Amino acid sequence: MLQTLYDYFWWERLWLPVNLTWADLEDRDGRVYAKASDLYVTLPLALLFLIVRYFFELYVATPLAALLNVKEKTRLRAPPNPTLEHFYLTSGKQPKQAEVELLSRRSGLSGRQVERWFRRRRNQDRPSLLKKFREASWRFTFYLIAFIAGMAVIVDKPWFYDMKKVWEGYPIQSTIPSQYWYYMIELSFYWSLLFSIASDVKRKDFKEQIIHHVATIILISFSWFANYIRAGTLIMALHDSSDYLLESAKMFNYAGWKNTCNNIFIVFAIVFIITRLVILPFWILHCTVVYPLELYPAFFGYYFFNSMMGVLQLLHIFWAYLILRMAHKFITGKLVEDERSDREETESSEGDEAAAGGGAKSRPLANGHPILNNNHRKND
């Protein structure tokens, strides 16, 4: 049964054009071709990425945060309350009004005190500003290096300037070491992002992020073993071209450098729109949808690859909408937060703090919010 499924999965007619077999892609005469087995190394490399990330965040990002004066807002902790804690962990973090009244009777607190307890408890679970800065620093470093390395891999290739050459001789196209390592490192990084997504800072587009990571992993993997490598290198470099700008804008936002953050965000928005909504659909997708049909009839791999590209393009449109909405609010002076942010809740009243098990009032040292929203007065 398993052997039958294995044989069917690797059936040449699924992944290769007509009249071609996997035997045509075996190494010969000093020419090396991509193989599915090459991808096995990406899983241990992904674990290595997680280890490197841990030490990077500890010994590079944390000192950098201190250097840039990234500060936290002092948060009031919710006082111990077994009744409310049990509800919080088992039933929900935002009780409805009827549930608030029930919890009020069970805990002996007023409804206002119960609501305040849940606000504080939710804020306790929200990631710290330092955690956000560390993550942004790590992603910025990778995306910047990956973009530079990717451009170095493709800038001297003829298909970078003439996309019809992407399919010249396909699929009998040998690989070179720079393409191999570019692919393995990119795929390993996205595996590491998927492995760590549960513990990373969660945003409102959490589900979209998962879809993006999975689609990217599938696309990179398929484009490798089906030898769509030339197109794949173009797509990866194009994606990396704007990601490092977004992460750097986040870093400066968390540091309170408002002007720098806003200026970088504007550059990011322009680059994102040009690369994801112009170059990708009208050049790259045109290259992968139209040109192959001039060489061979459509087959399953052709439809599969372009379907995954379509999923990514839909995500790009969704994110472009959020970016443009943020840019409009920024221009009109109405921007209050990142459209994808998990905003920290503030205390609506200080009068009930003592009864709720209060303590000292919150003293904001430096209030870091998502992109383009900060309460600092620092102008750089």
List PLM regions with ranges:
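Membrane-helix and juxtamembrane interface regions of eukaryotic multi-pass membrane proteins
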Residues: M1-R230, K250-G256, T260-F272, L280-V311, ...
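Alpha-helical transmembrane segments and their membrane-interface exit regions
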Residues: L238-A249
